[in-house]
């Protein structure tokens, strides 16, 4: 401490109740930052700027000392940090330090002498506890200890060795109260900001005699701190926080200052080494991470919060007056705001410019708050800020009305476009595309509404929640549509392929026909099931996917049933039987038309043809497998409830039809089968008669002797042909044609064709002649019938046929 400073120019006692004035010559002296009247000194920053090097910035450390009165706290600081805190007059034990003092440490005592720290060290000397001067009044002790704990990086707890393990002697009661209040005031910041800030509790054990190891003393004291922390009354949300989340603990022992002065000095120097040489005790998480001027402001705010905390003090009359006046100002300012608000936002814009609206929001709110600040800032700061928050809430509520209106309009417009976009997907990459569209929609709306949200004060969470629900409804409905579309397309594809398979099998039915058709059906069904494997790529639930597969299964079996009945109706069955009959009856194995020369051949072929046709009748009237079992669907397609569920078909006569038995495998009923057989027999019998008639006509031929007569009588004509070149050429061509037909084995078919052509020509000639000569066919037919002795009531058609047969 400078020897040039005179007694009259300085206050060398920390017990002074007035603030020490800052003077350029007092660079090593302390400044009282909190006096006995609990007032914070506003000159602290000025003191630091004059005592510490320029541009301190963040390069500083704050160390404070805490402990019982007259335990040598100030002496420890002076010896270690070379400060000038007043110490106790050993001839008279009384309180020396009053309030809280702050001093700049120019150098630190180390084993190598006085060492300058790389960082600027500021030391706080806190008024001792348990002093007789304050007696039972522990209010300032609690507040001073709490202040030191809240503003320091390292809190030195100065105790004697004999105090370790004691409760009151080690100030455990006071520490518990201080920790409890510190937790309630500053604990929430650790949750809200995820703050990892800690304070190092450096326990300096004084008058250490060396009998008990320091490690044992440290273990005892640390366990006492942990037990004390566990017994704290913590807020519910802070119950999980541990002592180690807030504090680190370290220990250092010092010998007796009077009895062992050399060892005491060595202990001081070793502690200095730990601070500045090894940089062992300062850690980044202890620092408050604010510049020195910010720390001064922080310290002032901390003291104000500690001093005015409701748990420690009651509202004063000044606060009550401030509350009344601030409420009055809020009401006046808000009414003025409402007038401007109505002028600006009374009528909504048809095509809103959200950026412009957001700017109007901000300007109007800032003007309103500025009016309030001018009138209310002179009152109690806490009340002023509280009522300012209330005014902001009132203003934001009015803005929220406009915000909600435009949010609703914007959401409605965007949802319509979203719906159109979702429908346009047509199931292509549906789940991924819908996710992209919905994410883009919400992001677009949030971005747009962010322009009128007053920098996020007006939350769009309600809008996005409702929007997400609407999006989910749209997507859910479209999912059902797309799911049904996929099922219907799959059923349609299966139906087409199955129909082709059935048609192919109808070309040549056999006992394995339905095995082949069923195998094709199962293959097509399995192809669909394998393709989707329970997931249709629509983002639908497992339950919806299962229902879709059940619907596909029901519709596929229904399609199987309908395809069989569509392709094998009784009309088509009759045509099929006729075609099979004709294949054998009219054509040979080479596909050439047959010419019957005798009735025996005709009857044999007729029997074979009819058997060939009727062989497939049992196969095509009921769907049976080669093992004789009928095809049975895996699901009852005739169940009325299932038909209504999967097909939307409500059978009105379902109650009347409950007793009817439906057989999936039955394609043609027995009655229909009888009708088909009757018609088939009639048709084939007609073909048989027609063919037999042509044989009879063919057999009736000219006698052979007639040809001799023709040769004899037509010899002259024959010679005339030979002598005529034209006629001779025609005769050669005719002979060559007959020879070629003979060699190609086509002579008989050619004769048949010629004969039938001639017969048809004659028949047509007779018909035309009859139409000319006879006007009333039926009358003439009856007359002819009477002449022939027929029944007059017989149909005219029968008589007409008889006439034709007789004529032929």
Curated annotation (Swiss-Prot):
<feature type="topological domain" description="Lumenal">
    <location>
        <begin position="723"/>
        <end position="725"/>
    </location>
</feature>
<dbReference type="GO" id="GO:0016320">
    <property type="term" value="P:endoplasmic reticulum membrane fusion"/>
</dbReference>
<keyword id="KW-1133">Transmembrane helix</keyword>
<protein>
    <recommendedName>
        <fullName>Protein SEY1</fullName>
        <ecNumber>3.6.5.-</ecNumber>
    </recommendedName>
</protein>
<dbReference type="InterPro" id="IPR030386">
    <property type="entry name" value="G_GB1_RHD3_dom"/>
</dbReference>
<dbReference type="GO" id="GO:0005789">
    <property type="term" value="C:endoplasmic reticulum membrane"/>
</dbReference>
<comment type="function">
    <text>Cooperates with the reticulon proteins and tubule-shaping DP1 family proteins to generate and maintain the structure of the tubular endoplasmic reticulum network. Has GTPase activity, which is required for its function in ER organization.</text>
</comment>
<dbReference type="Pfam" id="PF20428">
    <property type="entry name" value="Sey1_3HB"/>
</dbReference>
<feature type="topological domain" description="Cytoplasmic">
    <location>
        <begin position="747"/>
        <end position="808"/>
    </location>
</feature>
<dbReference type="Pfam" id="PF05879">
    <property type="entry name" value="RHD3_GTPase"/>
</dbReference>
<dbReference type="GO" id="GO:0003924">
    <property type="term" value="F:GTPase activity"/>
</dbReference>
<dbReference type="GO" id="GO:0005525">
    <property type="term" value="F:GTP binding"/>
</dbReference>
<keyword id="KW-0256">Endoplasmic reticulum</keyword>
<keyword id="KW-0472">Membrane</keyword>
<dbReference type="InterPro" id="IPR008803">
    <property type="entry name" value="RHD3/Sey1"/>
</dbReference>
<keyword id="KW-0547">Nucleotide-binding</keyword>
<keyword id="KW-0378">Hydrolase</keyword>
<comment type="similarity">
    <text>Belongs to the TRAFAC class dynamin-like GTPase superfamily. GB1/RHD3 GTPase family. RHD3 subfamily.</text>
</comment>
<feature type="domain" description="GB1/RHD3-type G">
    <location>
        <begin position="57"/>
        <end position="286"/>
    </location>
</feature>
<feature type="transmembrane region" description="Helical">
    <location>
        <begin position="702"/>
        <end position="722"/>
    </location>
</feature>
<keyword id="KW-0342">GTP-binding</keyword>
<feature type="topological domain" description="Cytoplasmic">
    <location>
        <begin position="1"/>
        <end position="701"/>
    </location>
</feature>
<dbReference type="InterPro" id="IPR046758">
    <property type="entry name" value="Sey1/RHD3-like_3HB"/>
</dbReference>
<keyword id="KW-0812">Transmembrane</keyword>
<dbReference type="InterPro" id="IPR027417">
    <property type="entry name" value="P-loop_NTPase"/>
</dbReference>
<feature type="transmembrane region" description="Helical">
    <location>
        <begin position="726"/>
        <end position="746"/>
    </location>
</feature>
<feature type="region of interest" description="Disordered">
    <location>
        <begin position="1"/>
        <end position="21"/>
    </location>
</feature>
<feature type="binding site">
    <location>
        <begin position="67"/>
        <end position="74"/>
    </location>
    <ligand>
        <name>GTP</name>
    </ligand>
</feature>
């Amino acid at each position: 401490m400078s020897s040039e400073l005179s007694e009259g120019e300085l206050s060398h006692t920390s017990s002074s109740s007035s603030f020490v004035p800052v003077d350029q010559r007092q660079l090593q002296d302390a400044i009282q930052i909190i006096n006995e009247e609990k007032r914070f000194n506003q000159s602290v920053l000025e003191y630091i700027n004059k005592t510490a090097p320029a541009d301190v910035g963040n390069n500083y450390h704050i160390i404070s000392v805490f402990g019982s009165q007259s335990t040598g706290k100030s002496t420890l600081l002076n010896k270690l940090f070379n400060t000038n805190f007043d110490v106790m007059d050993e001839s008279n034990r009384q309180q020396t330090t009053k309030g809280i003092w702050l001093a700049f440490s120019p150098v630190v005592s180390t084993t190598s002498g006085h060492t300058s720290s790389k960082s600027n060290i500021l030391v706080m000397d806190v008024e001792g506890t348990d002093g007789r001067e304050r007696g039972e009044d522990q209010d300032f002790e609690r507040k001073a200890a709490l202040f030191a704990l809240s503003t320091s990086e390292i809190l030195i707890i100065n105790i004697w060795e004999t105090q370790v393990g004691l409760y009151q002697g080690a100030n455990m009661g006071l520490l518990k109260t201080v920790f409890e209040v510190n937790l309630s005031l500053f604990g929430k910041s650790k949750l809200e900001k995820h703050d990892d800030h800690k304070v190092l509790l450096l326990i300096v054990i004084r008058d250490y005699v060396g009998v008990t190891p320091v490690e044992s003393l440290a273990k005892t004291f640390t366990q006492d701190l942990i037990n004390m922390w566990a017994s704290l009354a913590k807020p519910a949300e802070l119950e999980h926080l541990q002592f180690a989340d807030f504090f680190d603990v370290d220990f250092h022992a010092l010998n007796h200052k009077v009895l062992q002065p050399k060892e005491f000095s060595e202990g001081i120097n070793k502690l200095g080494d730990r601070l500045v040489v090894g940089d062992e005790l300062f850690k980044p998480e202890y620092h408050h991470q604010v510049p020195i001027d910010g720390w001064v402001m922080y310290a002032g705010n901390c003291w104000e919060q500690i001093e005015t905390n409701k748990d420690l003090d009651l509202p004063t009359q000044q606060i009550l007056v401030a509350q009344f006046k601030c409420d009055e100002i809020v009401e006046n300012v808000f009414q003025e705001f409402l007038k401007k608000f109505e002028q600006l936002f009374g009528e909504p814009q048809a095509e809103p410019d959200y950026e412009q609206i957001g700017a109007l929001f901000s300007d109007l709110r800032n003007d309103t708050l500025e009016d309030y600040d001018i009138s209310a800032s002179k009152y109690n700061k806490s009340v002023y800020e509280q009522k300012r928050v209330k005014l902001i809430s009132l203003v934001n509520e009015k803005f929220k009305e406009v915000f909600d209106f435009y949010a609703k309009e914007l959401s409605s417009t965007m949802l319509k476009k979203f719906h159109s976009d979702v429908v346009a997907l047509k199931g292509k990459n549906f789940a991924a595309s819908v996710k992209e569209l919905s994410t883009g929609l919400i992001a677009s709306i949030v971005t747009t509404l962010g322009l009128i949200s007053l920098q996020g004060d007006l939350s769009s969470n309600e809008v996005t929640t409702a929007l997400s629900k609407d999006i989910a409804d749209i997507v859910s409905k479209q999912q059902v549509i797309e799911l049904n579309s996929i099922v219907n397309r799959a059923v349609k594809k299966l139906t087409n392929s199955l129909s082709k398979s059935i048609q192919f099998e109808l070309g040549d039915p056999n006992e394995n026909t339905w095995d082949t058709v069923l195998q094709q059906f199962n293959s097509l069904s399995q192809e669909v099931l394998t393709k989707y494997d329970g997931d249709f790529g629509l983002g639908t639930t497992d339950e919806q996917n299962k229902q879709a597969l059940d619907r596909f299964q029901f519709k596929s079996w229904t399609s199987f049933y309908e395809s069989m009945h569509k392709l094998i109706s009784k009309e088509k069955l009759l045509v099929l039987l006729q075609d099979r009959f004709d294949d054998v009856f009219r054509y040979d194995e080479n596909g050439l038309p047959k010419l019957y020369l005798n009735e025996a051949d005709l009857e044999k072929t007729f029997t074979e043809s009819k058997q060939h046709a009727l062989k497939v009748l049992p196969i095509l009237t009921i769907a049976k497998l080669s093992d004789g079992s009928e095809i049975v669907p895996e699901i009852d397609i005739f169940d009325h409830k299932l038909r209504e569920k999967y097909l939307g078909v409500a059978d009105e006569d379902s109650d009347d039809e409950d007793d009817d038995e439906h057989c999936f495998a039955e394609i043609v009923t027995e009655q229909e089968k009888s009708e088909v057989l009757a018609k088939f027999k009639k048709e084939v019998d007609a073909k048989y008669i027609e063919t037999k008639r042509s044989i009879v006509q063919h057999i009736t031929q000219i006698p052979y002797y007639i040809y001799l007569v023709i040769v004899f009588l037509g010899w002259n004509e024959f010679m005339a042909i030979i002598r005529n070149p034209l006629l001779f050429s025609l005769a050669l061509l005719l002979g060559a044609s007959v020879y070629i037909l003979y060699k190609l084995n086509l002579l008989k078919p050619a004769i048949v064709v010629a004969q039938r052509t001639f017969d048809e020509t004659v028949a047509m000639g007779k018909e035309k002649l009859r139409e000319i000569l006879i006007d009333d066919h039926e009358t003439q037919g009856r007359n002819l019938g009477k002449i022939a002795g027929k029944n007059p009531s017989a149909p005219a058609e029968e008589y007409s046929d008889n006439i034709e047969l007789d004529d032929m």
